[in-house]
Amino acid sequence: MAAQNPLADIQVYKRYKAKRRMEGQKKNSCTIAYIDSLQYYCRRSLSHKSCFPFPSQHAFSRPLPLSESYETWHALELAFCLTRPYCTFHSSLEISSQQLTLRPPLG
């Protein structure tokens, strides 16, 4: 099993986030940013290592696919994240300049 590279993950995530921010202008940016921020919190939490493997962890080491796959990956990651008690969403999470109406996690 390949070792995780948090720095590479973060670099890819930043590029992905920038693309999603642009796409969000044309989509439901509130929902997209909510899922993005929840995933980001889970990845950067103190239980970071315990949060892996996400179902799509290896996808982050490959070129990002077409936008349709983003939703699939995020749905898998969000579902996985929400099953972990230490990955629950915290309202104190800082969300980069997004104006959001935050909702509690599903369930």
Curated annotation (Swiss-Prot):
This is Putative uncharacterized protein YGL109W. Partially overlaps YGL108C.
